A protein has these predicted regions:
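Conserved catalytic-core segment of NTP-binding enzymes
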Residues: 89-181, 185-187
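A short, charged/proline- and glycine-enriched loop
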Residues: 1-3, 110-111
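Walker A (P-loop) phosphate-binding loop of P-loop NTPases
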Residues: 12-13
């Protein structure tokens, strides 16, 4: 339970925040309270939804100071899993300062897991290739690709499915995961009211709750593959 989970994608609208929300909930279902580090200062919905439920920190990874503060936060919370919700524009910060984090993983006694959320567009893959150049996979860093079911079934991700990038990820020990789609009316209410999954069960009508339970169970199974 000493891992850092980066919910990444380097572009807006791929589903990073929903993935982070599901990952936090999956830890809570296991009786483990993670630390949330929110780096999306333009749209900190995950932070605002969870700030009263789990430990939270809000940082900007556009500058060196944010990376320094993140390492210090990780040092203070050893033994606690960490969920990092990344901002859409963080590729420049990763390229410049990512080694600040990566170089300290050994001393922190932590490993890093990147969950890279993709849609069906080419730039998702191009940004992933750039990320792998800046933060290569290795013994201390696993990279998994998450096909977001909101954009269609796994078979529709043709660019990724037939890519050398997929082969590169899987040869390095990474997985290709299929994150379930949540009905729009349920997802929209969660986003609008900034609800946690547990909070949504208290606020939503029965039909919404039934759909949320279905999605939550599927998400838990998918994320369980990387929560070791």
């Amino acid at each position: 339970m000493n891992k850092i989970y980066l919910c990444a994608g380097n572009k807006g609208g791929t589903g990073k925040s929903m993935l982070a929300t599901a990952l936090i909930d999956a830890f809570l279902q296991r009786g483990v309270e993670p630390l949330l580090i929110e780096t999306d200062d333009a749209n900190p919905d995950v932070f605002k939804a969870h700030s009263e439920r789990v430990q939270c920190a809000a940082l900007s990874l556009d500058e060196a100071d944010g990376w320094i503060e993140m390492v210090n936060s990780l040092d203070k919370t050893r033994g606690v899993p960490v969920v990092v919700n990344t901002a859409a524009r963080n590729s420049t910060g990763v390229a410049r300062y990512g080694q600040t984090l990566k170089s300290t993983l050994g001393e922190l006694g932590r490993t890093m897991v990147t969950l890279w959320v993709i849609n069906r567009q080419r730039d998702s893959l191009e940004l992933l290739a750039d990320y792998l150049d800046a933060m290569p996979a290795g013994a201390d860093h696993q990279v998994h690709v998450v096909r977001n079911g909101y954009f269609g079934s796994a078979e529709k991700f043709q660019l990724y499915n037939g890519s050398q990038l997929k082969q590169r990820i899987e040869e390095a020990g990474g997985l290709t995961l299929d994150f379930p789609d949540l009905a729009d009316r349920v997802a929209d209410q969660m986003a609008t009211q900034r609800l946690t999954i547990q909070g949504a069960f208290k606020e939503m009508p029965l039909g919404h709750r039934a759909e949320l339970i279905r999605w939550r169970d599927e998400a838990f199974k998918v994320l369980g593959q990387v929560m070791t």
